[in-house]
Amino acid sequence: MANLYADIILPLALRPLSFAIGDSLAEVVEVGCGVEVPLGSGKVYTGIVSRIHTTRPPYKNIKEILSVVRTEPLASPEQLALWRWIADYYMCTEGEVMRAALPSLLKPNAESHELFEEEVFSLGSEQMLSLGEGVRSEEALGEALEALLPRRKAQYKAMMEFCDKVGTDRVFSGAELPRRQMEASLAVIHKLVEGGLLQTTSRERSTAEIAAELIGHTTLSEAQTVALDSTAQNFTRHQTVLLHGVTGSGKTELYISLAANTLAEGRSVLYLVPELALTEQLVERLRRAFGDGLTVYTSRLTARARTETYIRLSRSRGGQIVVGTRSAILLPLNNLGLVIVDEEHDASFKQEDPAPRFSARDTAVWIAHNLGAKTILGSATPSIESFYNAYTGKYGYVRLDERYGSGEMPQVMISDTLRSAKRGERKGHINKELADEIRAALAEGRQVMLFQNRRGFAPYIECPDCGWSGRCPSCGVTLTYYKKGEKLRCNLCGHSEPAPHKCPSCKVAEPQPQGFGTEKVEEAVAEMFPTARVARLDGDVAQSAARMRAVISSFENGQTDILVGTQLITKGFDFEGVSVVGVLNADNLLCRPDFRAEERTFQTLVQITGRAGRKDNCGRTIIQTSQPDNNTIIQAARGDYYAMVRNQLRDREAFGYPPFARIITITLRHTSAEMVTFGARKLARRLKELIGPEAVTDAHPPAVSKVGDVFILEIMVRIERGVSPSEVKALIAEAITEFGRDKVVRRISTTINVDPN
């Protein structure tokens, strides 16, 4: 019998290493199982078997696997194939992919390998609601309903909804209603259960059974029905389809219909969203459709919850539906039939640090083409790369260009901030046109959203006499001023210090806030509209999940009149009461040193505009800018996506940017500016020798060139059409390997980012 060897993925930044399989383990070592192996001087590591073969490794001394620590596979063959592709495409190691894919309690190490060995995980059950035993008479129910008014209107409304859906002729006999069919929130239903007005029971039902009931019973508009049929037709010719639907067009209803069809076939569905903030509203809608069989997977779950989810999914044969953020693409979903990537244009789908620096969207496309699933990419403002792939026939393309129901696209107005300032028609960073719209909306009981893409009170403070401004001692960037707490803070490294009341440089004047952030807008709006209830949603608020949920819930329930926020409020929320949206400074969106700046400006403006005028009101959006003649801002105001794309494709083809070329960046970091400069120049020269001088830039500082006392330089490699990406990547790897062996520069950190944002 030939000797057997196994390639082992270790939780290190290494390629898989080969070990011999001893005779005693030959029948128990399987692909995907966990094993202990010796490495280095007396060290033992736990890894995952990725391949078993008979080819002798090119090592002088071949070590044997010590033991099998987990016979149940931690990774399926499909997962291992995905890990290999991610490692190859994004120029990292399978060990780094494994560390990202496995929950912490399953990551191979001596302490945790038996933790969940005997756990049994049940499939989801359907939660059923019925009238509480104590109120099953007209008199008792009537008294209970009267007691809810006037203070608990949400509970009263939920009870009326329950009685209406069950039917007055059946409600007193204890007839049941699936909880998912209730429009009321889970919190309201829990209160009713606690009060004895409702009671719950569990009924075991598969997600496939629930999905089968949905088919043909989902209410779609004529435009949605046409789009759904077109998507199905496109899937006969393409594995990936781009759904280009305007804001408010009801893309979620299409996703639910597609998911129901897939689940009814016993196949699994993965629904990806870019931000945690999006999941709350979406989960409510999906639970109403698919019941408690829905799985939610985000980075904010506990380690145990993530581990339980991972094992349950790995043991399932299919018929699962999971909604999650970027990391959910690495879950072990067996018999995967459909991947939905909502807001596919969003930069959050790309992981920047640490490795693997992968795109969940592009990984979903690979899964569609290699693992037999279908992928739908949805957006009101598709990325130019995705649109180009649809335009050239690589993806299918479906257009949904009218809003669902009676909702109309909002009217958009561009307001010139310079002209308003000259006329004295500007107060608290709000032009008269926007102030008038806010006042009218509040008078009608409508809500307002105000977008300013800077957090804090002001971007920086400056001395009016000598020009001093506070800068981070570790990063060199200006410190953001926060009025609450009177502090200056670096939004890169977190450094914080008290705001000075006297200039530290000239010792004369008091530094003054310059510019404005969300904190200042919140204060100014509260002063301008003293009777309005104002809240803020930005990165500072989002640091607390509970606080963020409270802000969103308050606005959703009409308890907040004006919501001030950053990019977070552009993320696909569906707030019915919003009739006015204000963009306070569109200029700072354009001021980014990035070839995607205009595309992202357009996307942000269209997305935030789309928050206005849902359901039965048209809505108004005011875009404030000092550049009212800027093409991108005009195109966004008109919602003219195709004009923006035409302009951008023309420019990118001329200058060699995606989708007409691929980009790889190599980032170098060191605590010495001189050392990182020396090393970066040396590496750039070598890359130019290997790849060609036209394809490699000189070393240059990125937009943020120092963080936490570490200096940063970048080299960009451009891969033109017709050039093999794999060959260029091999040459980059060769240069990086040589660089790492050089004793002079080897302490310089290097990272590779394929297809950077």
Regions found by a protein language model. Name each.
Residues 683-723, 728-735:
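C-terminal structured "cap/appendage" subdomains that terminate the fold
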Residues 215-221, 225, 237-677, 685, ...:
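Inter-lobe coupling/hinge segments of SF2-like helicase ATPases
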Residues 1-379, 391-407, 690, 716, ...:
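Accessory, non-ATPase domains that flank or precede helicase/AAA+ motor cores in DNA-metabolism machines
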Residues 41, 455, 709:
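A short catalytic or substrate-binding loop motif that flags glycine-/basic-rich loops and adjacent residues
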Residues 51-53, 102, 202-204, 452-454, ...:
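A general secondary-structure junction signal
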Residues 3, 14, 618, 659-663, ...:
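A general secondary-structure signal for short beta-strands and their flanking turns/coil
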Residues 529-532, 687-696, 741-747:
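Short secondary-structure junctions
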